[in-house]
Amino acid sequence: MKYDLIIIGSGSVGAAAGYYATRAGLKVLMTDAHMPPYQQGSHHGDTRLIRHAYGEGEKYVPLVLRAQTLWDELSTHNEEPIFVRSGVVNLGPADSAFLANVARSAQQWQLNVERLDATALMTRWPEIRVPDNYIGLFEADSGFLRSELAITTWLRLAREAGCAQLFNSPVSHIHHDDNGVTIETSEGCYHASKALISAGTWVKTLVPELPVQPVRKVFAWFKADGRYSTKNRFPAFTGEMPNGDHYYGFPAENDELKIGKHNGGQRIQAPEERKPFAAVASDGAEAFPFLRNVLPGIGGCLHGAACTYDNSPDEDFIIDTLPGHENTLVITGLSGHGFKFAPVLGEIAADFALGKTPSFDLTPFRLSRFSQ
């Protein structure tokens, strides 16, 4: 049997692509080396932020707004909502370049973002402490996503729509010819007109020339009471420290508040180098500088987890066909800020398989930018 689309890597983007391509009427085969959702990638740990006014650049805003529409639609397929509209407050020095980007994208796209000075910030959320020169940009329409629930939902919906799924079966080789794409797996060879490579952190095992660096990252849950929960209208947050370190976190659930540091981490070259949480001496204390200064009422570390970022050189996404192979789309280099975009990236992959022109300007995400 020849498929219209083979998906290599069915974590976040691949799971979404499998659903949207199958829903569009294509014959799709989803593959993965593991059984998604899983702990080996970048999507575990229960939750991920979604922000619309985007500090990483205005080029992402059209994508994330479309993603939000798709998240809202996906949430209707579950009793438990996938998207929680908690609001997100971005904290940092008034002269922060990141916050300037947030404000600029909000203005350009007419997004609902409220600017709070330090006094107003601490009045609204007395649990938060910031220096006098800090501001908060609060986006009430943003929030967080239940990442593993999302992937489980996409997989179920794709399967129910007739998508073939081959999991726990690593792809060892990809071959291109005039008839399309062939993959080799432990279960045999499979053929398709087109392929999506969304293999995440270890994409270079299949495409060694891609400029992607795996980075080991950690996040942890700390003791927190009801003041820090959505029931008390406590928001999700990002926070920039005076030294430039960036943190992110979520409202407490079940008296546990999750927080992580976005920058830093350990560069790794193989899956076995991604040691579990607490294997690196600094893991448990990584969030202390932020908690001690900004959220001093939070208690001790309860537990943590390790994940991996697939970092591109400029930490912007890679969305492009493989050089010399126009029938193979690669989506990688999501650099620790990609999960919120998973549905729109999956939709882009489905449109690619259908032969449709992308609805978005993907020029900033082409591979050619690294050779200029």
Swiss-Prot record:
Gene that specifies this protein: solA
Described purpose of this protein according to its UniProt entry: Catalyzes the oxidative demethylation of N-methyl-L-tryptophan.
Family affiliation: Belongs to the MSOX/MTOX family. MTOX subfamily.
Coiled-coil features, chain-numbered ranges: none
GO MF entries: flavin adenine dinucleotide binding; N-methyl-L-amino-acid oxidase activity; sarcosine oxidase activity
Protein name: N-methyl-L-tryptophan oxidase
A Gene Ontology cellular-component term: cytosol
Domain of life: Bacteria
Entry keyword annotation includes Oxidoreductase: yes
Binding site for FAD: 4-34
Keyword Flavoprotein: yes
Xref: PANTHER family: FAD DEPENDENT OXIDOREDUCTASE DOMAIN-CONTAINING PROTEIN, PEROXISOMAL SARCOSINE OXIDASE
Residue numbers of S-8alpha-FAD cysteine PTMs: C307
UniProt cofactor(s): FAD
Catalytic activity, EC: 1.5.3.-
Keywords: FAD, Flavoprotein, Oxidoreductase
Reaction catalyzed: N(alpha)-methyl-L-tryptophan + O2 + H2O = L-tryptophan + formaldehyde + H2O2
Subunit structure: Monomer.
Cofactor descriptive note: Binds 1 FAD per subunit.
Species annotation: Salmonella typhi
